[in-house]
Amino acid sequence: MVREDPSVNPWLIRIAVDRATGVIVGQVNFHAPPDDKGMVEIGYRVNPAHRGQGYATEIAHTMWSYAARHPDVRVLRANVRPDNEPSRRIIEGAGFVKVDEEIDPEDGLEYVYELTAAGYRARFPT
């Protein structure tokens, strides 16, 4: 994808590294660049040894902040399994609203959350 269109690179996978130790703690990405409606969907994962230390919150907010300030983005989306309470707390705490449910072929039932880019910027101005 990047070879054909290098402009998609900022939307793809990034490695999350602890600033103090240099240890890889997880990864984050958007599933694709903004679609024709201006929507981007985040995906993130924190390695098990580093969970519960605030990394997921920082990772998600770093990417949401980037996307919410991009001129082509109007809607931020996050899908999460109902039993993933830590991620649901992060998403709901950021102001996302559950708008749907869908079945993912790999993960099963997922809740679909959305927040407008303008709504994110209003809640987290910087």
List each language-model region with its residue ranges:
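GNAT-family acyltransferases
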Residues: 1-41, 46-49, 62-70, 83, ...
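Glycine-centered recognition micro-motifs in short, flexible terminal segments and loops
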Residues: 48-58
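Conserved active-site alpha-helix within GNAT-family acetyltransferase domains
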Residues: 57, 83-99
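Conserved hydrophobic beta-strand within the GNAT/NAT acetyltransferase core sheet
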Residues: 76-80
